[in-house]
Amino acid sequence: MVKLSCVIVGVPGDPFQVEIDEICELVAGLKDAIKKEKPDSIKCDADKLQLFKAAKEDRTFSASGAEEEKKDFRWLKAASDDVKKLKHGEKTAAIEAVVRKDQVLRGKETVSDVLMGMESPSISQIHVLVVLPEDSESEGGTSAQPAEKERLLKFLREQAADKKRKRYWHSEMDMDQGWELLDDFDLTVKPVSTVHAEADPADSFNWQSDLVQDGQEVVLTEEQQRGRYREYVERNIGAVLKENKLCVTAVDEGENVLSVDVPKLGIELRGRTDLLVLSDIVEETSDYLMHLPEVKMLIEVKRDAEASDFQALSELIALDILAEDPVMALLTDLNQSWKFFWVSKKSDDSDCICKATIKSPGEAFQVIRALLTASAETKLPCFHQPLKRLKLSQHRGYKNAECLQQYYKVAEVSGPDYELARAVAEHLVRSMPGYCCANESEP
């Protein structure tokens, strides 16, 4: 009699042992023994199991380092990384190489054939890999569902662990972080030239100053003048706003409406912008702001806008993920610097962010007015070619609908799972912008 250690591929769980007669037992009998040992994990008929010899190729080398023609096979070590991943339902490249279809053990082979040329089996080794049939789910369900559950739980736990994520605050985005963020999203910035266009004249915004007691003039901060510059922007595009039922809303400190998770990249974007152009329904109640209804663009206002490009890029990426339609970002000093950013594509069809600079307030407002009434692809003032705004096509987060779909898939076979249901619910709540706004404050 011999004891063989087995692992079911794709199903989380520890190795288990079966005892068989190595001399006369057929592989078909080994299948029966495996099913008998794991009745809760294996619901299909035993003859539908695929068994593989858990042996890795071990090439030998001469003293000179040259590879010799002789190739040995050795059992997988129970303590190896490959087997550790197997215990969690994962497959490595080495395991994929073992479970190739041309290496499946035939039912009429004997166990002695399997052991031929191998070292004597021991408890520190893995000897047989078990693969369940692909259609086993339709036959009453198998532990492929627990495997799906474990994968989903692992994903959800990683999202809940802040230490495993990279967090960016828009307001702290310097050059180093900015380039790192673009690299994370595999994005490049493409400058776009502009031309002079006839436009209604518009005055520059007058940044106010205060006189302190010693007579020194001090310019008030952007924060202190947000109400004034919001009215300035609204005044210059008011007719278009009214016609399209839009408004310009100032985002107060602490309202981190541009907070979003990007689970696929392990990234969190946090913070807000200064102004948003969106549906005027938000004027009915401030609660609607977190939902960003029909948002068209964000406006980041800086007294000196020359060194804040990466903050605007970060805010654009966050708004793109949160919004249903293509959006635009504007970084401006409300005087001679009006930088527009939007998502587009390069010639190789990869995502990029386009950047165009306009130096006249009149021309800038002409572009904004046209933008708010145009489709995603249209001819705008000051641009040579029609401007095509798109959505980021990659790196989207794990969608909430996918989490629910996977949960229902598991529950359909194994019944309600309260641990998984709680994890999915917490993930859904964490992904809500309102949750971020209520539970986080900008550093």
Swiss-Prot record:
Motif (Nuclear localization signal 2): 384-393
Motif (Nuclear localization signal 1): 161-170
Record Pfam families: Crinkler (PF20147)
One Gene Ontology cellular component: host cell nucleus
Motif HVLVXXP motif: where in chain: 127-133
Spans annotated as Effector domain: 134-439
Coiled-coil ranges per UniProt: none
Region (LQLFLAK domain): 18-56
Major localisation: secreted
Keyword Signal included in the entry's annotation: yes
Region described as DWL domain: 57-126
Signal peptide: 1-17
Localization per Swiss-Prot or TrEMBL: Secreted; Host nucleus
UniProt keyword annotations, A-Z: Host nucleus, Secreted, Signal
Family per record: Belongs to the Crinkler effector family.
Functional summary from the UniProt entry: Secreted effector that exhibits strong cell death suppression activity and suppresses cell death induced by a variety of effectors including CRN63, Avh241 and Avr3a. Protects host plants from biotic and abiotic stresses such as salinity and drought by up-regulation of many defense-related genes, including ABC transporters, Cytochrome P450 monooxygenases and receptor-like kinases (RLKs). Also enhances resistance to Phytophtora pathogens.
Comment on protein domains: The CRN proteins have modular architectures that include a signal peptide, a conserved N-terminus, and highly diverse C-terminal domains. The conserved CRN N-terminus harbors a distinct LXLFLAK motif, which is followed by the conserved DWL domain. A highly conserved HVLVXXP motif marks the end of the CRN N-terminal domains and forms a junction where diverse C-terminal domains are fused. The conserved CRN N-terminus mediates the translocation into the plant host cells.
Protein name per the record: Crinkler effector protein 161
